[in-house]
Structure formats: C-alpha cells, structure tokens
Amino acid sequence: MEGERKNNKRWYFTREQLENSPSRRFGVDPDKELSYRQQAANLLQDMGQRLNVSQLTINTAIVYMHRFYMIQSFTQFPGNSVAPAALFLAAKVEEQPKKLEHVIKVAHTCLHPQESLPDTRSEAYLQQVQDLVILESIILQTLGFELTIDHPHTHVVKCTQLVRASKDLAQTSYFMATNSLHLTTFSLQYTPPVVACVCIHLACKWSNWEIPVSTDGKHWWEYVDATVTLELLDELTHEFLQILEKTPNRLKRIWNWRACEAAKKTKADDRGTDEKTSEQTILNMISQSSSDTTIAGLMSMSTSTTSAVPSLPVSEESSSNLTSVEMLPGKRWLSSQPSFKLEPTQGHRTSENLALTGVDHSLPQDGSNAFISQKQNSKSVPSAKVSLKEYRAKHAEELAAQKRQLENMEANVKSQYAYAAQNLLSHHDSHSSVILKMPIEGSENPERPFLEKADKTALKMRIPVAGGDKAASSKPEEIKMRIKVHAAADKHNSVEDSVTKSREHKEKHKTHPSNHHHHHNHHSHKHSHSQLPVGTGNKRPGDPKHSSQTSNLAHKTYSLSSSFSSSSSTRKRGPSEETGGAVFDHPAKIAKSTKSSSLNFSFPSLPTMAQMPGHSSDTSGLSFSQPSCKTRVPHSKLDKGPTGANGHNTTQTIDYQDTVNMLHSLLSAQGVQPTQPTAFEFVRPYSDYLNPRAGGISSRSGNTDKPRPPPLPSEPPPPLPPLPK
C-alpha cells in the first residue's frame, strides 16, 4: 500500500513543475495551455455523452488527458486527436467498451458537425483508425499503464453524508468536483480528498452555510484529510474562482444529455403518479435554479472577496452580475441529474452518474426554499454566516409547509387510486343474477312456430353465484328456473342433496303411468339434471330417468361427451314440458338440437332398480319396444351435441346474446367438449360400466324401492354396440 502511494505521487506536480510543462517549453502560453486542456475536456464530455458512456468514464478520460500532457506537448499531439484515443481507452478500463468505428464517427460529428460521416472503406477513414490505435498505445506507454484513477467525487459523497448536508449543498459540491476536472489542474496538484474539501468549502461559502464543529472540537475537513487546513482551502477556493472568471462561457457549458434522458424516462415510467411527477418537477426546478446561478454566484463572490477573508457575503452589487453573465439552461449542467440512492461503498463508479439529489441526510425536506430565500435576501440585506441550527430554525416553517403539501398530494393520489382499484375489484366480484329468456314450444302444440309464442313461452333462467335455492314450480306456459353455479368446495354436498331430492320425487311420482313419464321426468329434472352421471357414479337411486340413462350405458349409447356436458359445466339444465310422443315424432329435430344444455333421454318408462351396490341386475323387466330401439340412433347422435330444453331447437333473444354465447362456448362443440380438471370427478366409476358383469353394476332395473336383492336375470343383456367416435 505504501509503495502504491509513492508510485501515485509521480502524478502530482508542484506549481514550478506545472509552469515548466512540455507545452510551456515549446512556447505555449500558460493561459493557452489551460484553454487547450479545457477544450479537450469539453470534447471528451461531448463525445462521452454521444457514446452513452458513464460520467465516470468521461472523468477518467479527462484525467488521462491531463496526465498525458504533463509528459507530452500540445504541439506534438493536438487535443482533438488525443481526446478520442483517451476516451476509447477509458471506456475499456471502466468496462464500457465502445467500437472503434463508433468512436471515430462520434469524434468526426463533434469536430465537423456540418460534414457527412466518412466512408468506412475510404482511405481517410482507415487512416483515422490507424492513428487512433497508435495514439492509444502512446497514451498507455506515457501513463506507464497506470490506469486506475481515484476521483474527488467519491470523497464529496462521503463527506456530505458525514456532515448531513442538505441536498442543495451536496449537489453544488458534486457539481464543483466535476468542474474541477474540466476547468482546473487540481487533479495534477492535489489528492482527491483535498480537491473534495475545496469543492465542499466553496459550496458552503456560496450557500452561506457553515458546517458546525464536531463534538470533539474538530472541523469537518479534518475527518476527510488531516493535511487540509483552512488557509489551504481559502487559497484554493480563490484560485478556483479566478479560473472560473477567466474561463469562456462556451467551456462552462457542461452538457449532460444522459441526465435529461434519464429524467424523461423517469417521468414516463411514473404512469399517472401525480405525486412523483410533481416531486420530480420540484427537483428539476431546484436543480435548474441552482445550476443556473452557481457559476454566476461564484464569480460574483470572487469580485468581492480576498483569499484572507473566509466569509463571503453576497452584496447587492455582486448579485447584479447575474444578468451580465451568459448562462446556459439548467439541463446542460451536471447538477440537473435525476435523484438516485448513493451508497458510500459504491465509490465513484456509482456517484459519477449522479448529481447527489438523493444523498441521505438528516433534512427530509428539500433545500430549495433555503436556497431561493437566500438568493432573494441577498439582493436587499447582506447575508452573514449563520450556524446550522439558526439556518434550520429560520426556514423550519417553509420547509414544514412544503413537506405538508407533498404529503397531502401523496395522500390524495393514493386515495384516488385506492378508490379506483376498489371499484374495479368490486365490479369483477359482483355477480348479479342474469336472466336468460329463450322462447320454447309448449307441450300442447309442438308444431306451432316459435315466433308466434315467443312472448308467452319465454324460459327465464336466473344465474346467481351462491346457489342452493329450490327450483321454482313449473307453469304450463312459462318456466322460471335458477341455475346453480357450484363452487369447487360445494360440489359433493350439492350432489348428495340433489340425489336425496330425486329419491323423494321418485317416490312421489312412482304410481304415474308410463305415458306421462316424460312430463314428470323433466319436472324432477330440475332437482337432479346436473347430477345425472353422479347418481350412477355414486350408485345411488334416481328417478325413472336414471334407469333409461343406465340402460344407455349398458348398451354404450350414452357417450362420454354428454356426461362431460352434464358434469363439467356444473350448471342445471332447463326443464321441458313435452310428452313422450313428441320426441318420437320428431327424431330429426332431436338429432340436430344444439342450442341448450339439457340432455333428453326419450326412452319409454322403465321400472326402478335395486339400490344396493354389487347386486346382480334383473333385466327381465326390460321391455324395449321397437320404436324405442329405433330412437337409439338419434340419441347416439344427440349425445354428441346437447339438445334444447324440450328436445327441439331453441332460439335466443338478442338481449342476453353475450351470456348465451358464453354458455354455448362451454356446452356445444359438436361432440368435442373442453376437458376440465373437475370433469373426471363425477364420472370416475364410468369404467365399471364397460363390463357390467365384472363390475357388479347392472343396468339398474327393478320394480321395488326397498333394498332387497332383485331376482336373477333370466337372460344375458343384449350385445354391446361399438362406442361412438
């Protein structure tokens, strides 16, 4: 470590060495040499921003340039040639390498903005490439391959955090650290901690801020560098002000396009966040006001102070110089960079890109009001040096008012967005009942057209979220029905309830003749239609419709897709009021019915079956007439697509077209039903029906409701037809 310090001392020179630099020996005027250095630094800043490299890379290239011209002369190596090579080298050192072609094109654009870019295949371009590579090698050899640079910005950040300086003071100090690299040769004379102390001291004088002495009785600069004294700070501050006064305004224009782009991007990312946008606007105003008047205030200080006077009051005469100095808008100054969080351990690599608007300090309020009030008071009353406590007490009310305003703005924005989000969630969560009106044919005159009785025979279907209501009673012309949408947790309970209701309903209508079977079948359909395969899967009894369903299963005319349509959707189907003859008279209408969600089993009335699982079936009571066997073909087609509520095609009203389309998208796909995870929960025992004898499950026919075993079958069941495709 000690050897490294001794080696680094070779790049710090005395005043005599600076006055005897190679350029001076070749006859270059001292002011001219300083101007050449400033112009080269300005070119590096411009090129770095166009190449989109970090401020750290630009500052490193500037230090390379300063050190290079302590060994070489401007007469042998012009600054416009060395600057691109220095930036090309610094970009690689700071791990932001740029293509050689890009560096040459950017340098050409900065030096010759009116000319077109050179052709990459031309002799002039190839010569520039060769010259830049040679200059890079010369810079490396001149610097002795010592490429690691320590910048004062790191120490500025640490010190401002140590003394808990305001944002305004930290921002100005950071800005002066960058100016020290661009405009002075402090990087060749003093170590980075000393330069950082000078920048902070200069910012304190300009802001009329005095950093108090610590509890140990030490000044703040003693914690940064023990070799720094107050006399040295005053001397270097005066020298800095003199250099600023002599520097042309065009060299003070330190552009920072990256900061502007980052600020625009930050505003674009704050989508509708009014509080953040207004806060960014306030910070931009602070940055612009401070950066616009920094150099002017410092130059006015230099006219009214001497190096022996530590306190520099800004008089009315000096403040009038603000109008005589040509200043650039604040967006071109480094201090207008967006706010970021700085960590001391990140060092200069992070802090170079910032303007210290986000430095942690004890004042949560912005220092803009303090700065503006000082600027206004300086025109009327000469400001004196005040302590930190007095300064805070003086501006406590203004800072508190500003903080309250920002808090109110933030609260308003949050409340607005919370209200909007709550309304959006409540809109999605609210499930009002949807009434579906679908005209159907009455049972009295099935041949009458739909349009004549659409107003009288409308089927109203109410779809609430929380089901459980009992179905409304059937009317001859209008049927009101609640379709229950089951949640995942309520499926099994609803299955048990519906099966129990179907058992009671079956006992109630047990004595009705078979020619009226379909009317009562669909009347009980309101209780158990969504659990048709469930009753068979759970081996529980159902109404007479279950016997016809299981007969279809035994003959494999009950397709799997129809069970999916009845179980996966978990919705109740619409009832029907047709007689048994209506189905047999219109098999063609049944085959092409695809407009509703109910399955119509139109077999003749069959006796009930035994209710105990595992008993053998009694098929002697099964008397399949010839018409019923003929209707199996349309029913096998019917299973491929759902039918209407009464077995015929149904029309839809335009009022609830969207809801009907949603139901159709779930229930009708011409036999191709969407598979859902819960679909297989209700048809789990379906494989048992593939072999009725082995599975012990019969076609469920019997003539009693008691749990006694039925008689043995007199003949085996008919052969099984092939499964539908």
Swiss-Prot record:
Which residues are listed as membrane-spanning?
none
Site positions (Essential for interacting with SIV Tat):
C260
The residue ranges flagged as biased composition, category Basic residues, are: 506-529
What residue spans carry the region label Histidine-rich domain (HRD)?
479-549
Pfam families in alphabetical order: Cyclin_N, CycT2-like_C
Q: Where in the cell is it found?
A: Nucleus
Q: Which GO molecular function annotations are given, in alphabetical order?
A: 7SK snRNA binding; chromatin binding; cyclin-dependent protein serine/threonine kinase activator activity; DNA-binding transcription factor binding; molecular condensate scaffold activity; protein kinase binding; RNA polymerase binding; transcription cis-regulatory region binding
Q: Which residues carry this modification: N6-(ADP-ribosyl)lysine?
A: K484
Assigned keywords, A-Z? Acetylation, ADP-ribosylation, Cell cycle, Cell division, Coiled coil, Cyclin, Host-virus interaction, Isopeptide bond, Nucleus, Phosphoprotein, Transcription, Transcription regulation, Ubl conjugation
Gene Ontology BP term (one) = positive regulation of transcription by RNA polymerase II
Give the CC-aspect GO terms.
cyclin/CDK positive transcription elongation factor complex; cytosol; nucleus; P-TEFb complex
What SUPFAM superfamilies does UniProt report for this protein, alphabetically? Answer: Cyclin-like
| Residues the record lists as ADP-ribosylserine modifications | S415, S473, S474, S530, S548, S551, S562, S636
What's the main place this protein lives? nucleus
Q: What family does this belong to?
A: Belongs to the cyclin family. Cyclin C subfamily.
Any domain commentary? The histidine-rich domain (HRD) region is intrinsically disordered and promotes the formation of phase-separated liquid droplets that enhance binding of the P-TEFb complex to the CTD (C-terminal domain) of the large subunit of RNA polymerase II (RNA Pol II).
Q: What is the official name of this protein in its record? A: Cyclin-T1
According to its UniProt entry, this protein's organism is Pan troglodytes
